[in-house]
Amino acid sequence: MSRRLLTSLASSSFGASYSSLTKPIAQATRGICDSACVRSHENPLGIPRRNPNPAPTIPRRGAPPQKSRIRGVKQIVVVASGKGGVGKSTVAANLALSLLQTSTLSRPARIGLLDLDIFGPSVPKLMGLENAGDPELSDENKLIPLQNHGVKTMSIGYLLRESCSHFPCLSTYTPNPENDTPVVWRGMMVMKAVQQLLFDVDWTTKTGTTSGSSGTESGSSDLDVLVIDMPPGTGDVQLSLGQLVAVDGAVIVSTPQDVALIDARKGVAMFNKVSIPMIGLLLNMSHFTCDSCTKPHELFGSSAKFEKAAMDLNLEVLGKIPLVPTISDGGDAGRPVMVQSSGEGEEVRQSMRSVGETVWEWLSGRERADVGTRG
């Protein structure tokens, strides 16, 4: 772990006036972790509390909380699915790269990828950042994203690795090189961790120094788009995001099976309830093309069922992603298909570029909600 982050964590003070819910949930058992374990129900990531802009909380009673923008982020797109195992995280990673590649801005686009899957984070593996080191802290005690393939990323997975003492008291099990340390938390801890990942990350890009009447100042630029990889289902994480953050649009990923489409419909209904606009549906694993007969085979059911579901929901079909080995192989190697050049993945890249262009078009036609900014 970086010396700066460890020192900051070890020297943090939270006062003695917290309620019983804010007491540390566990104590570290070895070495320097004994003094560094400062996590609590109110601060599950253990980030020092000198931030003048605390994350908003969801009130237990009364009116719903006011949605706000994430500081340092212009627009937000969430990638979700009702059913697990449909390739949502892989799509999210490749969508972020597609947005980077298909931008029509006059300068290189600034894209971020946030992993909100607390129990099953995939972004570190997919983006080739498993061994990239620990996130540093900014001067405002915010987590600094790790970057690869031109995309800034943040995930709780960066804080669970063997080398990271940021989670010294996560469980009674010793972390190991297989990176299989579990997050064993109840709902309150999960929701607080989500709030910290949303509002305690510094997404801005430093742009050097500028001279003015007030002297020399350091400049920074916001992300153009933050892609958020959601966990499957319609639970606490989705509800927290929908209540706290002004999201610009959502993409629902599904496969053609009835069981996946049923849950995809539930995901759309949930986003409608929390007033998150729908960009469209994306069909993943739509077909497999045999090398011998060159005929596409719909292994998981007819894509016509997916198209009918989209029609019933009055949503656009953003694309159809085929089942290609290079997608999973690239994800395992930390090289998403969008940064590969293999001929096998060209059909996928073309489909994802089209999706990226559609999302850019959607975002360019939206007016930013008139809400405050937190973080």
Enumerate the language-model features and the residues they cover.
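Conserved nucleotide-binding/hydrolysis micro-motifs of P-loop NTPases
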Residues: 118-120, 159-161, 175-177, 232-234, ...
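Residue-level signature of catalytic and energy-coupling elements of molecular machines
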Residues: 73, 84, 114-115, 123, ...
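Phosphate-binding P-loop
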Residues: 68-74
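N-terminal chloroplast transit peptides
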Residues: 1-21
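Walker A/P-loop phosphate-binding motif and the immediately C-terminal alpha-helix
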Residues: 75-118, 139, 268
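Inter-motif core of Ras-like GTPase G domains
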Residues: 199-205, 221, 225, 237-259
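Phosphate-binding loop that captures ATP/GTP phosphates
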Residues: 107-185, 191, 214-221
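C-terminal lobe/tail of nucleotide-utilizing enzymes
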Residues: 3-5, 21, 25-61, 268-375
